[in-house]
A protein has these predicted regions:
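N-terminal mature-domain "stem" immediately C-terminal to a signal peptide or N-terminal signal-anchor/transmembrane
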Residues: 1-25
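Beta-strand segments within the central parallel beta-sheet cores of soluble alpha/beta enzyme folds
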Residues: 65-66, 166, 228-231
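An alpha-helix initiation/capping motif
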Residues: 140-141, 168, 207
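Pan-zinc metallopeptidase signature
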Residues: 176-253
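Small-residue-rich helix-loop
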Residues: 145-146, 163-178
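Acidic/His-rich structured neighborhood in mature extracellular/periplasmic domains
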Residues: 20-160
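Amphipathic alpha-helical surface "interface" segments used
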Residues: 73, 170-173, 235-238
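Long, contiguous secondary-structure blocks with strong helical propensity
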Residues: 45-46, 58, 153-166, 191-197, ...
Length: 253
């Protein structure tokens, strides 16, 4: 079921997968020596999910599928379970990254990041927001940021450190830009641009600002367990933003 779902949601069809392999033949070939090491990550993934159960005791734990995709998704989740694209975690000594474009070179991670991406998609599986139509930039960014923040609590890291490293020195200016656009549905410059990112600006800054909102909300909460449940059940994103107090962290009032 996981392969069928990943094919539908992320790969598209066999021709698109073949095209990705043809465009990066040495990179895909290098995955053969890494995929047997996936088994080495299973204990760490299980430990991470056990910590997630401690954080959210009433959570659901779906099946996890590890698949080779077409370099466009590290993971996704739906009712089938969690689908992880292992080709996005092929960074290792000797990996031929020269075949990859700038965005892929920035985002391709190591196998050690697999527990964090599993945790991130696990959070998406738990989220219960009901949104009619396309989410606003605010809604989408908080959804992704909550997933990164809770994943970090369980896995000890999140999957977007390179984005944080770029964004933090520019935090105040980015907040002003985000605030002006957060109620629209244009994600350009903030989310899901992948290889279409412009210049040195990372493609997924929305993950960073959503993480900052989630972290601020959690740190201000007296009841941390209740705060985690509120993050997962959130239906009022403007109220969540206001309660986080994050604007003051960015120098606002």
């Amino acid at each position: 079921p996981g392969l069928e779902t990943f094919l539908r949601l992320r790969i598209g069809d066999a021709g698109k997968l073949v095209a990705a392999i043809d465009a990066h033949p040495r990179y895909y070939a290098s995955l053969r020596r890494l995929t047997p090491k996936l088994e080495d990550q299973v204990p760490r993934i299980r430990d991470t999910l056990r910590r997630m159960r401690t954080l959210v005791p009433d959570a659901v734990f779906p099946d996890v599928y590890f698949l080779v995709g077409r370099m466009n998704s590290g993971g996704t989740a739906d009712a089938t379970g969690l689908m992880i694209g292992v080709e996005m975690f092929g960074r290792a000594p000797g990996t031929p990254l020269d075949e990859l474009g700038d965005w892929h070179r920035a985002v391709v991670g190591e196998f050690d990041n697999l527990p964090a991406i599993v945790a991130h998609e696990w959070v998406h599986f738990q989220q219960r927001a009901r949104i009619d139509g396309q989410p606003t930039l605010l809604q989408a960014a908080i959804g992704e940021g909550v997933a990164d923040f809770i994943a970090e609590l369980g896995a000890g890291r999140h999957i977007n450190q390179h984005v944080h490293d770029w964004a933090e020195p520019r935090a105040a200016a980015l907040w002003e830009e985000f605030r002006a656009r957060m109620d629209g549905t244009d994600y350009a410059g903030w989310l899901y641009e992948g290889a279409n990112a412009r210049g040195d600006r990372p493609a997924d800054l929305g993950y960073w600002i959503g993480y900052r909102i989630a972290r601020a909300y959690y740190e201000r909460a007296d009841d941390k367990s209740a705060a985690l449940r509120e993050m997962l059940d959130n239906q009022d994103f403007h109220a969540f933003l206001a309660a986080s107090g994050v604007e003051r962290e960015f120098g606002g009032h």
